[in-house]
């Protein structure tokens, strides 16, 4: 298998892990916060942090990937939280992240803050 193919396969797997641990809610307020958090996480990226965590787990003898999956997702959520908060008007006031509107531009500054906080928790 070519390196690019292997990398693409791993990214697909990591993206599925990240989506697996995103919460759901029927509550209207919570749903908007979750939607904003999902918008941020699903913007893409290299996913290098969870990939390194998975490979480190394997190199240390880990066999059951179910054990490391929540930590992989949490690591990416924490990274995304830092980006969401960094983009806020009180910080860098960025309009775009990864080629699309930032979370606070789509959902408002208040939900940008709440989405970032939710990703950290």
Regions found by a protein language model. Give the residues of each.
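Conserved glycine-bearing catalytic or ligand-binding loops at nucleotide- and phosphate-handling centers
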Residues: 3
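Mg2+-dependent prenyl diphosphate-binding active-site environment of isoprenoid biosynthetic enzymes
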Residues: 12, 16-23, 27-121
